């Protein structure tokens, strides 16, 4: 079931219909529906889809090669390109005669394993952007990596993208579309508890009560949601213990910097750095009282 993301799909289709080289960056927290958006976008188009894995450069190159060869020949093969440059250049050349999409999902996994990948992409984009009809999409769940290593001014790929999409959780109106059988009050309660993360919303059942849904997910050690907060944080930060302490402090009522630092047991100057990172990651947000 695919819900929402009409504006993102419209913009992606606009880029696709330009017929010239385009480079889109899609990023956001895990579970917000980035891959679902891409799958929906490319479902009726010529596309090579490759998902990076947290493994070696060799393994990722082999997987990319399989995706490319399967697309171009229609058969699975065990052969591999000799380098990322030769694999990617082959795709750029393929796209000189037809419109083609190349998706590299979980790009941070691939780029961390192959340190020269960003520079290779930079070189190929500069070489082929006027002749290739390729639409390149880089997607990543590590927001810190995508912002620092792809979008930042000092990143090799800076200035070459056509568009960037920061995929956020759904708002209340979009979330309600998941729960046609809930009353307005139940929809509001569910949004307040779960938020708008699509993968979490799909695990809720609007045929059950709010209480039953909470027991089946948040309070069930076997559910997919149960361990998600800690695992997601570990993927983004180096010292999850301090971040967890800050999140716990905020969740238990500490709202001012002095209160948070007192509960955490660290100076406000230290806590402020961690809090800034949590805000950037979209885990907490700052609200100023009105009046």
For each predicted feature, which ranges?
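Phosphate-binding site recognition
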Residues: 1-291
């Amino acid at each position: 079931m695919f819900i929402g993301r009409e504006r993102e799909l419209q913009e992606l289709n606009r880029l696709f219909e330009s017929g010239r080289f385009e480079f889109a960056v899609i990023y956001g927290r895990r579970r917000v529906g980035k891959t679902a958006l891409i799958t929906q976008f490319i479902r009726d188009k010529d596309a090579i889809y490759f998902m990076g894995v947290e493994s070696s450069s060799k393994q990722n190159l082999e997987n990319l090669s399989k995706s490319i060869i399967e697309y171009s020949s229609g058969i699975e093969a065990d052969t591999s390109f000799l380098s990322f440059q030769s694999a990617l250049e082959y795709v750029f050349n393929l796209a000189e005669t037809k419109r083609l999409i190349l998706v590299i999902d979980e790009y941070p996994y691939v780029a961390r394993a192959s340190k020269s990948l960003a520079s290779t992409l930079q070189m190929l984009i500069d070489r082929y952007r006027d002749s290739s009809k390729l639409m390149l999409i880089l997607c990543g769940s590590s927001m810190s990596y995508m912002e620092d290593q792809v979008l930042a001014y000092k990143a090799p790929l800076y200035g070459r993208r056509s568009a960037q999409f920061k995929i956020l959780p759904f708002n209340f109106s979009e979330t309600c579309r998941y729960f046609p059988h809930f009353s307005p009050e139940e929809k509001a309660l569910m949004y307040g508890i779960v938020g708008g993360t699509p993968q979490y919303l799909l695990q809720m059942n609007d045929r059950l009560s709010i209480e039953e849904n909470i027991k089946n997910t948040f309070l069930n050690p076997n559910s997919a949601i149960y361990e998600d907060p800690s695992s997601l944080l570990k993927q983004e930060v180096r010292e999850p213990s301090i971040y967890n302490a800050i999140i716990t402090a905020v969740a238990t009522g500490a709202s001012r910097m002095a209160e948070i630092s007192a509960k955490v047991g660290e100076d406000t100057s230290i806590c402020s750095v961690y809090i800034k990172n949590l805000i950037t990651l979209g885990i907490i947000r700052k609200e100023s009282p009105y009046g």
